[in-house]
Amino acid sequence: MSPHKDFQSSSTPVPVCMENDPNCDLLRYLIALAIFIGLIAIFMFGCKAAMRLLTRKRNRDTTQSDTDVIYPRDDPRASRSHQNFGFMDPPPRYEQIFKRGGGTPSVITTREAPSVTRSTGDGSLPPSYEQAALNARRESRPQLPQGTLREVPLTAIDMEHPAMSTPSSTVLDMESEITNITNHAQACVHRYDASHANEVTRTAVAVTTESPAPAQSTSNALPELEAPEGGPPGYDTISLHNETVSTR
C-alpha cells in the first residue's frame, strides 16, 4: 500500500448528524432519557440514605410520648424551668393521685388549702405540692375549729318553703296541675262557645231581672253569675276545687 492511500484512509471525516436526520433525533432522545433515569436513581438513593440516618438517630434517642411531655419524667439532665413551666414540681401523675393501696389522694383541695403559701426554704421559688398542702393544713387547723366545719351535700339542701307545713307539699304534682289547667280551658271553651251563646244571654237576663234595686243594695259587690242547669261548672267552682286539691 502506498503512503498516500494510508493518509487518505486515515483522514476520512467522521459523519456528522444532519438537521433532518431521524437517526440523530433518536440518539438524542435516548441520551436524554438515560440522563433523566440516572437523576431519578440518584434522588431515590439519597432519600433512602436520609431515611436510614433518621431511623438510626430515632432509635438512639429516648422516645417521648404525649404523657411524658405533659408529665416529664425525673431526668437529672432536665432543668426545673422545663419541667412545669417554671414550677418546681411537675403535676402529679394518675398513679400518684390514686394509689393502688387505697387511702386519700395526695391532692390539695379548696377546703384544705384556702391560700397558697411560700415554702420555708427558698422564698424566690414556688412551693411544692406537698409543702403547700402541709402549710395549708397547719394554718387551717387553729383558725377553723373542727366543730364549725359542716359539710352539706347538694342533695341534702333543705329546699322546703318556710310557709309550707309538710315536706310533701313542696313537691309539685305536675300531672294533676296540667290536668286541671286542661279541664279549665275546655270548660271555658264549652261555656263561651257560639253554640251556647243563648245560655249566656238567658243567664244574664235572669240575673238582671232578679237583682235588687241599686238604692236597696248595701254594698257595691257585683252579683254572682250562676251556670245553667246541666252545663259545665263555673270558673269559681273550678278554682275552689283546685285550691282544695292543692291543700290536700
Swiss-Prot record:
Region (Disordered): 59-91, 208-248
Compartments, as annotated in UniProt: Membrane
One term under GO cellular component: membrane
UniProt-recorded name of the protein: Uncharacterized protein M01A8.1
Main subcellular location: membrane
Segments crossing the lipid bilayer: 30-50
Topology in membrane: Single-pass membrane protein
Entry annotated with the keyword Membrane: yes
Keywords from the UniProt entry: Membrane, Transmembrane, Transmembrane helix
Polar residues bias spans: 210-220, 239-248
